[in-house]
Structures are given as structure tokens and as C-alpha cells.
């Protein structure tokens, strides 16, 4: 059977929170089958466990924020994206602040951390959410949509009307049957505009933001001396975010995702719309790994590619 996965050993790292600017300690621990991805605020007097779930996402203005009993864990999308890309089903994430550290602004540090811990299969069938009917959410000209598809592919279009962004790819389509997440998506960094960063800092946000963890643009150009990691890094990062946003549903999706100018809020609304229609999806497993869609096999996802 196609099996669930966790990590082999405990790994730790330290980084800063993008918005708080404070030091955050992050510990990843193995978890038993059917645990899911569980975030734990270990800095609180009584630690609070917050399982990743579409219905636990609260604030989505600047990041995806998990909330439970007054406790929050913000900016979960890059770590969730890495878990999705490597096929991690079960994991405990201990964090000492209300923010996952931003690291270099991409998912690459989390991929490295998980690969350093080692990935192991568990004696339980991996569960997928198979989309059986189209589901769509619109907000003005923005939209996000899921269609039935035997695999996982995404098509994302951005439109920032900025000269530096316009010169790069505005549209990207990826099918993980023939694309390596680690090689093609994981290193794409978050990006922001200098004037917005100043405004956010005045509001007490983005205190940890810098060119070490984001692509920063002025009105005309990219300010980072080292330029871009991918020719189409902007749209690739939006896809990285979407992969993480969608993975909070609890299982990998078997679906085709199409989006235009979507963000954390629209992605979460799409998941809620899916879950509200029980006839639009089903939970499936694969007794024979060869019967599963290409790209979800252990070797395909966990290779050091």
C-alpha cells in the first residue's frame, strides 16, 4: 500500500518571526499514523496543540494563521508547503512564539530540515482527498478553483502590474507527476514592495522582514543584489503558498487547482467550500502503490533532487 510518512528523528532550528522580528525556536518531532500536522505553542503556560485544519485558519490578511482557544500560530504556509512537497502526513511542530520563523522566505530551509531528520514510511495507508466535482470561489476578478484530476496539478496566474514582475513569468502550470517540488518550487522566496514594508512597520508588522528573507522591490526594480533564484520566482512563490494553504485540509488533494490572483484568504475559502459539499470529494487510499497517481511515491517525493 501507499503508506503515510513522518520524520525519523527530532530536528530543531532557530529563526526570526517575519512580523514580530523576535527569535523563534522551532522543533519538528515524529508523530504516529493519523496524527496529521499538529502545531504546539510550547511557550504558553499551558501548551496549546493546534492541528492543521482548514476550519482552524482564522486571519488570512498577511499569512495563514491557525487559531485555537485564543492561541495562534501564524505564517504556517511555507512549512506546510514543504510537508506537502515531501509527502509528510504526520508531524509535531513545537514553536516558542506565535509565528513560524521566516527563514530565507521560501520553503527550502524546511525541506532541508525535514530531509536532515530523515523521512520514514509508517504502517498505515496514506489518505487522499479526491475531488469529484468542481468547486470554485470568486472575489471580484480573483478566483480559485478545484476540478477532478487523478494527480495534483496547479495553474496560477498573477497580475501585479509592476515592471520588474511583468518581465518574469506571470503564469505557471505545474503537474507533480513530472515536476520536482524540491527543485522547481521550494526555493521561491516571498516578495514585498518597499513602500508597503515601511507602512507595515509603522503598524508594528514586518519587523523581521529584510532582503535576507524576501525579494524587495521599489517602484521599478528588484533591490536585492543577488537577483532572482528562478526566472519566474514571483509566480512560483504564489504557487508555493497555495500548496501550503491547500495542505491544511489534512490530506494531499487529488485535484487540479486553477487560480487567478488568489491569496491565503481565497485559498482557505476554497477549502471550506469543498468541505461544505460532501458530494464534491471522497477520501481514498491505494493498496497498490502502482495504482496511485505518478509523483506521490516515496522515492519520487523524497529524493534529494
Swiss-Prot record:
Its cofactor is Zn(2+). It holds the Pfam family LpxC. The keyword Protein biosynthesis does not apply. One of its GO terms (cellular component) is membrane. The keyword Hydrolase applies. Its EC number is 3.5.1.108. Zn(2+) binds at residues 78, 237, 241. Pathway: Glycolipid biosynthesis; lipid IV(A) biosynthesis; lipid IV(A) from (3R)-3-hydroxytetradecanoyl-[acyl-carrier-protein] and UDP-N-acetyl-alpha-D-glucosamine: step 2/6. It catalyses: a UDP-3-O-[(3R)-3-hydroxyacyl]-N-acetyl-alpha-D-glucosamine + H2O = a UDP-3-O-[(3R)-3-hydroxyacyl]-alpha-D-glucosamine + acetate. Gene3D superfamilies: lpxc deacetylase, domain 1, lpxc deacetylase, domain 2. One of its GO terms (molecular function) is UDP-3-O-acyl-N-acetylglucosamine deacetylase activity. InterPro entries: Ribosomal_Su5_D2-typ_SF, UDP-acyl_GlcNac_deAcase, UDP-acyl_GlcNac_deAcase_C, UDP-acyl_N-AcGlcN_deAcase_N. Keywords: Hydrolase, Lipid A biosynthesis, Lipid biosynthesis, Lipid metabolism, Metal-binding, Zinc. Signal peptide: none annotated. The active site is at 264 (proton donor). Belongs to the LpxC family. Catalyzes the hydrolysis of UDP-3-O-myristoyl-N-acetylglucosamine to form UDP-3-O-myristoylglucosamine and acetate, the committed step in lipid A biosynthesis. This is UDP-3-O-acyl-N-acetylglucosamine deacetylase. It comes from Burkholderia thailandensis (strain ATCC 700388 / DSM 13276 / CCUG 48851 / CIP 106301 / E264).
Amino acid at each position: 500500500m501507499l503508506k503515510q510518512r513522518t520524520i525519523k528523528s527530532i530536528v530543531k532550528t532557530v529563526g526570526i518571526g517575519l512580523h514580530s522580528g523576535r527569535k523563534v525556536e522551532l522543533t519538528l518531532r515524529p508523530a504516529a499514523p493519523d496524527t496529521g500536522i499538529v502545531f504546539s505553542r510550547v511557550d504558553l503556560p499551558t501548551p496549546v496543540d493546534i492541528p492543521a485544519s482548514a476550519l482552524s485558519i482564522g486571519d488570512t490578511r498577511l499569512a495563514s494563521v491557525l487559531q485555537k482557544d485564543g492561541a495562534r500560530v501564524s505564517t504556517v504556509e511555507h512549512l506546510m508547503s514543504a510537508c506537502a512537497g515531501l509527502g509528510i502526513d504526520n508531524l509535531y511542530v513545537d514553536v516558542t512564539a506565535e509565528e513560524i520563523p521566516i527563514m530565507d522566505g521560501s520553503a527550502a530551509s524546511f525541506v532541508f530540515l525535514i530531509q536532515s531528520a530523515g523521512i520514514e514510511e509508517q504502517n498505515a495507508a496514506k489518505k487522499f482527498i479526491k475531488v469529484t466535482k468542481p468547486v470554485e470561489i470568486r472575489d471580484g476578478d480573483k478566483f480559485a478553483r478545484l476540478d477532478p484530476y487523478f494527480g495534483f496539478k496547479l495553474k496560477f496566474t498573477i497580475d501585479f502590474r509592476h515592471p520588474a514582475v511583468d518581465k518574469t513569468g506571470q503564469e505557471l502550470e505545474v503537474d507533480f507527476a513530472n515536476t520536482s517540488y524540491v527543485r522547481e518550487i521550494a526555493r521561491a522566496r516571498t516578495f514585498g514592495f518597499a513602500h508597503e514594508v515601511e507602512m507595515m512597520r509603522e503598524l508594528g508588522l514586518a519587523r523581521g522582514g529584510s532582503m535576507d528573507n524576501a525579494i524587495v522591490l521599489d517602484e521599478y526594480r528588484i533591490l536585492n543584489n543577488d537577483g532572482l533564484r528562478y526566472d519566474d520566482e514571483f509566480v512560483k512563490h504564489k504557487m508555493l503558498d497555495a500548496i501550503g494553504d491547500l495542505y491544511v485540509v489534512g490530506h494531499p488533494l487529488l485535484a487540479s487547482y486553477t487560480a487567478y490572483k488568489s491569496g491565503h484568504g481565497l485559498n482557505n475559502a476554497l477549502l471550506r467550500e469543498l468541505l461544505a459539499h460532501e458530494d464534491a470529494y471522497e477520501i481514498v487510499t491505494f493498496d497498490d502503490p502502482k495504482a496511485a497517481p505518478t509523483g506521490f511515491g516515496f522515492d519520487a517525493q523524497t529524493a534529494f533532487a
